[in-house]
Amino acid sequence: MLFPPSLPPTASGRSLGRVETPPGLVRFMVGLAEAPKGGRVLEPACADGPFLRAFREAHGTGYRFVGVEIDPHALDLPPWAEGVVADFLLWEPGEAFDLILGNPPYGIVGEASKYPIHVLREVKGLYKKTLSTWKGKYNLYGAFIEKSVRLLREGGTLVFVVPATWLVLDDFSLLRSFLAREGRTEVYYLGEVFPGRKVSAVVLRFRKGGKGLALWDTRRDGETFTPLLWSEKPEWKGEIIRFETGWTREMEASGPPLGSLFHIRFAARSPEFKKHPAVQKEPEPGLVPVLTGRNLKPGWIDYESNHSGLWMPKERAKELRDFYATPHLVVAHTKGTKVVAAWDEKAYPWREEFHLLPKEGVELDPLFLVEWLNSDKIQEYVKTLYRDFVPHLTLRMLERIPALLPRKGNTERRKHGPYTSPESAGSF
């Protein structure tokens, strides 16, 4: 057994990714949980075992209860449960479980200056070697999901409450495929249920063996959650999970997805700009502001304000990204899931946002498309499908947005003049 790293005396619940679960949510999850009499029931990152206690109260005493906790000071289980001080992600119990339930820690493991879960950064390399779904800036809760699935018996059940980000983010693509291979996945959308936390949550109910996906909405009345089946996908292979409707399917059938028309690029990052010899921190003649998301407005770009604190010669911006030299479509990455688009006629340097370059042979009226992307219809489309799963529009979400093209025979085209104010944008 691998025991946890030596935790600093100042290790806190926050630095370990711990968040208290509201009692009503615990009861809802226990209602989704099941195990055979005499079965083994596990709560990872258990602290005082709220899920074990609630399950025993609801289902009785005929089970073997185990709790694993990395922080010995937080472990406080009742005498009828076995408590284990260990790093759950590296723990090897030698025996499988019939039910695993709880609220795993969430956060990214890394340096204290950037990431909340910094006390585990020394063992991050071991996590990556041990787990097959680790990808990108993997959130710790994804690692807990994979580890738990591996510890289940065939036919065993996992019930976790986790952030909704895994439904759509690329960092969790390996996890979604893993779940699809290993069993049947059910997702219960909750929204923001943790007091004081701007995190949209879902309950994941997974049964090892079987296949397919079921997506549930929930209706909340005080501390009571009522599930409402939204959709089922018997042949789910790990694709992103969305609240599809007949209307969203009609929308997507109405035009080609943006990803089929454009190469979608992301801006150069702040460190790249700061290392570039032509970038200055004070304005000088011949320099232009490096633009950020705050310069991007629906249908127009504020070329005058400087929110980055950086200036550079416009003609040298292409040294950071070649597309900076070409007028192109810019779509917000930093406006929540709201779609905000404008045509960058002046071809300025950007520190943020998505930059869309037409693929070879694609001819478009960019300003017609800008108007469509900023429309109420597109905002409703995105909100319907993705609700508040993630704080920002993602590449995969953007790629799927249908492009409305001008009707054939409509030869009237807008002039491609730069729009630098709300008034000029509204005139096209």
Swiss-Prot record:
Residues 407-428 are annotated as: Disordered. GO terms for molecular function: DNA binding; site-specific DNA-methyltransferase (adenine-specific) activity. The keyword S-adenosyl-L-methionine applies. PROSITE patterns: N6_MTASE. GO terms for biological process: DNA restriction-modification system; methylation. It catalyses: a 2'-deoxyadenosine in DNA + S-adenosyl-L-methionine = an N(6)-methyl-2'-deoxyadenosine in DNA + S-adenosyl-L-homocysteine + H(+). It comes from the Bacteria. Its EC number is 2.1.1.72. Belongs to the N(4)/N(6)-methyltransferase family. This is Type II methyltransferase M.TthHB8I. The gene is tthHB8IM.
